[in-house]
Regions:
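Short glycine-/aliphatic-rich beta-strand segments at the starts of folded cytosolic domains
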Residues: 1-17
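A structural detector for beta-sheet-dominated domains
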Residues: 8-12, 41, 55-57, 102-104
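Short amphipathic alpha-helix segments
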Residues: 14-38
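Extended Gly/Ser/Thr-rich low-complexity repeat segments
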Residues: 22-27, 62-85
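Short amphipathic beta-strand and strand-loop transition segments with alternating hydrophobic
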Residues: 37-45, 103-114
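Conserved short beta-strand edge segments in small beta-sheet-based binding/regulatory domains
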Residues: 72-112
Length: 115
C-alpha cells in the first residue's frame, strides 16, 4: 500500500487556494513523470475559513527531492515531510495564495494540545 503524507490546509478562499495547490502539484507530477499522486478533499467551512486536506504520495515527494538534489536538502527541516512542507509553503506564497499548511499527523498529536 502506498504511503501518503496528509497536509491540513486552512484558507479563506477554497476555490482559489485549491486551484493554486492543484496547479503546483500538477507541475510536480509532470516534472517527475508520475500520475494521480495527490488528492484534495472538499472543504469544511467554519469561522470564515475553509479547512481541507491535501494527500500526497510519499513517492512523489521523494522523487521531487531526488530531482531537486542539493536545493531540496538545503530547505529548513529535519525530515522529508518538513522540507517538502517548507518548499510547498514557499510555492504557495509565490502564487499569493492565502493558505496555511500543517502536517495532519502533527496537528493530531499532543504537540498542539489535546485532540
Amino acid at each position: 500500500m502506498e504511503e501518503r503524507i496528509n497536509i491540513n490546509v486552512s484558507a479563506t478562499n477554497y476555490d482559489q487556494s485549491s486551484g493554486g495547490i492543484r496547479t503546483i502539484l500538477t507541475a510536480v507530477v509532470e516534472m517527475v513523470h508520475e500520475e494521480n499522486e495527490f488528492r484534495i478533499t472538499d472543504s469544511e467551512f467554519a469561522f470564515g475559513w475553509h479547512f481541507y486536506v491535501v494527500s500526497i504520495n510519499r513517492l512523489l515527494i521523494q522523487k521531487l527531492a531526488d530531482q531537486m538534489g542539493e536545493d531540496f536538502q538545503k530547505l529548513k527541516g529535519k525530515s522529508l515531510e518538513k522540507k517538502f512542507l517548507k518548499w510547498f509553503s514557499q510555492k504557495i506564497q509565490e502564487k499569493n495564495l492565502k493558505a496555511k499548511l500543517a502536517i495532519k499527523e502533527e496537528m493530531e498529536s499532543g504537540k498542539y494540545g489535546i485532540f
